[in-house]
Amino acid sequence: MSWQRPDNRTAAQLRPVSFERHFTRYAPGSVLVKFGHTHVLCTASVAEEVPPFLQNTGQGWLTAEYRMLPGATQQRQPREMLKLSGRTAEIQRLIGRSLRAALDFRKLGSRTITVDADVLQADGGTRTAAITGGYVALHDAITWLYKQGALDPAQGSPLRQQVAALSVGIVQGEVLVDLCYEEDSQAEVDMNIVMNEQGSFIEIQGTAEAACFSRPQLLQMLEMAQAGIQELLQAQRQALNLER
């Protein structure tokens, strides 16, 4: 018997995706991204400084922070104060690595962009929503830098490629994309895929949670994730008024 998705989606169907830009007043880039019932607030802030290892190089940097609000899940989670959990540290490193792939740091100049991803409501796929929404916030922050006269249009944009991410997994032997929490908790295999607009992979995280997976299953997961990510890239372009 095949798995019945809780929201009656097909195996390859994404949850409803939306981006509400300029969600906050002060950050140069901000967006409320929704993957179904997963809601993440992504902001991109700019500081005219770089980490010590980049000083006097003329290059910029991007870093990311990720947190989940206590009431984002069905059971309240304590705030992480002095020490991050291993999960939080792993996720924010993933977000940072993924979004750094979108930038040419020589063109960004000697400044740091910090992308903050705050999960307001969690129903699976928070890290992939954070990456996908984080790119939209990053794009708006770069636009803000141009408006401030901090970037020279003649030198070309620091943004070199779009980036989006999607979860994919195997539940009761069936490959599914964009897993909700119920599906994620039942998955035999859980993966997170990050790609750019050229269809190249930035990161693949895959774990056999309850069962091993075959090479054909791996290829099927990658193909279905790639198709779903193309939909997310198009949704980003529509939100940014960059439709092709």
From Swiss-Prot:
Phosphate binds at residues 87, 125-127. GO terms for biological process: rRNA catabolic process; rRNA processing; tRNA processing. It catalyses: tRNA(n+1) + phosphate = tRNA(n) + a ribonucleoside 5'-diphosphate. Phosphorolytic 3'-5' exoribonuclease that plays an important role in tRNA 3'-end maturation. Removes nucleotide residues following the 3'-CCA terminus of tRNAs; can also add nucleotides to the ends of RNA molecules by using nucleoside diphosphates as substrates, but this may not be physiologically important. Probably plays a role in initiation of 16S rRNA degradation (leading to ribosome degradation) during starvation. Homohexameric ring arranged as a trimer of dimers. Belongs to the RNase PH family. This is Ribonuclease PH. The gene is rph.
